[in-house]
Amino acid sequence: MINFDEFMKVDLRIAKVIDAENVEQADKLIKITVDLGKEQRIIFAGIKDIYEPDSLIGRNIVVVANLEPRKMRFGVSEGMLLAAGDDENGVFLVTPDTGASPGMRVR
């Protein structure tokens, strides 16, 4: 278990997907460009078998904004999106209510 102070170190932010494309040589990856309000980031997400890239564009999602960048075979991933799911029911992106805008901190 982590304590409350450790949990508070995780910076969850609202991000708007402004571009998404399949990573051609990867079975599961989509390259997603997000707007975090004051900056844009690239995130590689293993959701290719669940979402079409075009269906992601314009959506607000929740991302981990202070995750250390991770060098991958196809580029550097600068965050992680949040999703819920299991093998039986599939995977679903965590999305905010209407009114939330890019850069807002999830509390």
Stretches found by the model and what they are:
Residues 1-107:
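Phosphate-backbone binding interfaces of nucleic-acid-interacting proteins
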